[in-house]
UniProtKB/Swiss-Prot annotation:
Keyword ATP-binding: yes
Stated name of the protein: Dephospho-CoA kinase
EC primary class: transferase
UniProt record similarity statement: Belongs to the CoaE family.
Tree of life domain: Bacteria
Cell compartments where the protein resides: Cytoplasm
NCBIfam families, per the entry: dephospho-CoA kinase
Underlying gene: coaE
Keywords on record: ATP-binding, Coenzyme A biosynthesis, Cytoplasm, Kinase, Nucleotide-binding, Transferase
Amino acid sequence: MRIIGLTGGIGSGKSTVARIWQGCGAIVIDADAIARVLMEPGSTVLEEVSQVFGRDLLDAEGKLRRAELAARAFISEEKTAQLNSITHPAIRRQIRRGIECARAEGVQVLVLDHPLLFESGMSDLVDDVVVVDVPAELRVRRLVDLRGLKEEDARHRIMRQMSDEDRRMRADYVIDNSGSRDVLERLARELWQRFATQVE
């Protein structure tokens, strides 16, 4: 089984590429979706996060107030590392389980969609790395316009991630998403076809 690591900075369009590939028949493990499940009320991960970052992160129903966690965790490298030290091992365990299930089911090409593929040390799980690349200033605009983030918050989150240059240097393939959605769709489909052909 060939495992493709799909990554990119916040606001790069990485998840859009994952959806395009799913439309082409790709099986995708979504690290963000795993993280959301691990943060559901009653989970041991959420319990540990609330102990470290404050019980007031939880609402009356025990649900995580995500924006508040982001405000506390992304304020410094130390706090970000603290959050990652809690979440990354649990996410990695779930990803490994997903990979083993896919292998047992005879999946030929598996996609691991992970925003922190390198930072989390999970690039060792994949055979090829695809980076979705967009200039930082364009990502800031997209985060503000499409996700409703404040400009300062958008810049802060981008700063806390690996630099675009470092990501590109570690990539086997780079998809440039500085153009239109139609261009992204064409580039993503062409690359997926290449992967699918290589395993036939």
